[in-house]
Amino acid sequence: MTYTLRPYQQDAVYDAIDWLKSTIEPGLIEAYTCAGKSLIIAEIAKRITAMTGKKILVLQPNKELLQQNAEKYKLTGEPYSLFSASANSKSVRHNVVFGTALSVKNQLNSFCEKFCLIILDEADASLTPSILKIIDSIRSKNPNLRVLGLTSSPYKLGQGYIYRADINGKQVPEDKAKEPFFTKQIVHISGR
């Protein structure tokens, strides 16, 4: 079974890869619910792995998203690993690894400098102390680590927007974005 990306998904993949090639700053893809974020993740992971030969860690907040993202990646025909106690698998054998935060955090020694990219699904909910610890740990082994987030809601209650600049480069006022993790919203896919 294969898949075909919709034009807006393909554009998101191209824009994300351009961003990842140009900077080590964290970038964010905002895409409405049902926009096919799992397929976007799969295509980015497949292409970056093919370009670099290095490992990619895809982090999601729960087993259900882990299974959904892994199933979409399976459509690429490329092998992948799961690293999640809730999925009964803790492997980093293949270049693309789908993991849950707690399982990865509890075995950070399994994640080395060979990881060039962390993709955060549900980035608005994923920016927890555990995720930040994972990023810091892998970045200490690979200072060129890239981080890419995907979300349908780039706003976190109590903190505001999770990015510093919108897709047009306009800075988000400090009162609307308290210490945002992502440097820029690099893609915006609206439901309209």
Predicted regions mapped to residue ranges:
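Loop/turn-to-beta-strand initiation segments
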Residues: 54-55, 93-96, 115-117, 143-148
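Post-DEXD/H (motif II) to motif III coupling segment of the RecA-like Helicase ATP-binding lobe
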Residues: 124-192
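Switch/connector loops and helix/strand junctions flanking conserved nucleotide-binding motifs
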Residues: 66-69, 91-92, 106-107, 156-163
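Inter-Walker segment of RecA-like/P-loop motor cores
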Residues: 73-110
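Conserved RecA-like ASCE ATPase "motif II neighborhood" in helicase/translocase motors
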Residues: 96-136
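Conserved pre-motif I regulatory segment
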Residues: 1-30
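A short beta-strand-to-loop transition that corresponds to the Sensor-1 phosphate-sensing loop
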Residues: 62, 99-103, 150-154
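Conserved Walker A/P-loop ATP-binding site and its immediately adjacent core
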Residues: 35-43, 48-75
